[in-house]
Amino acid sequence: MSADIRFDSLKTIVPAVSRETADRLIAFEDLFRKWSKAINLASPSTLADLWNRHILDSAQLFPLAKEATRWLDIGSGGGFPGIVTACFLAERSGGCIDLVESAGKKAAFLRTAAGHLYVPARVHSARIESMWEKIETPQVVTARALASLGDLFTLAEPWLSDGAKALFQKGRDYQREIDESRVGWSFDLVKHPSAIDQASVILEISNLRRKTD
């Protein structure tokens, strides 16, 4: 797939995207493929369609909170959506994203990617719970393929209960996860259909509170 085709496909997700951001994302794809030969960053079955399955899928989050400058991505793994978001924030004055990843090799990759791409990302090689009091409440918390919705609420509660909103990407079982999480939590919810996978959604969560009854 040529750079022009990638750029055009990216514009269908983020119409106002610059060529500079697209070039960063293309460079990230190349770096990801290189590192994937040495460490397991993503399922091998998805590497053939890495641009669509991971990069475009991650890119669709940014327009949902495009005015936000302070982001946090938990369980960042191979950088989806964290490094992708950082590529967009690189052109935003004062923009920054914190990436939390407990696996040392993946955290090393994230640091390399952030430096290679010159993007405003801070990488924390730590468990999410250990960062509750160390990372200032962001405007947006993201997570992709990390845990059930209820478990994500527990992991992100200190930030979400302090005014941050969440953008969590979920697959076909999302409604069951929503129903189960409402047993212990109250929250406002907006469901955004995925532009990449018709069976998936992006759950926009705000005003999270733990139920006490």
UniProtKB/Swiss-Prot annotation:
Keywords: Cytoplasm, Methyltransferase, rRNA processing, S-adenosyl-L-methionine, Transferase. Gene3D superfamilies: Vaccinia Virus protein VP39. Its main location: cytoplasm. It is found in: Cytoplasm. GO terms for cellular component: cytosol. Its EC number is 2.1.1.170. The keyword Methyltransferase applies. It holds the Pfam family GidB. It catalyses: guanosine(527) in 16S rRNA + S-adenosyl-L-methionine = N(7)-methylguanosine(527) in 16S rRNA + S-adenosyl-L-homocysteine. The keyword Nucleotide-binding does not apply. S-adenosyl-L-methionine binds at residues 75, 80, 128-129, 144. One of its GO terms (molecular function) is rRNA (guanine-N7-)-methyltransferase activity. Belongs to the methyltransferase superfamily. RNA methyltransferase RsmG family. Specifically methylates the N7 position of guanine in position 527 of 16S rRNA. NCBIfam families: rsmG_gidB (TIGR00138). This is Ribosomal RNA small subunit methyltransferase G. It comes from Brucella suis biovar 1 (strain 1330). The gene is rsmG.
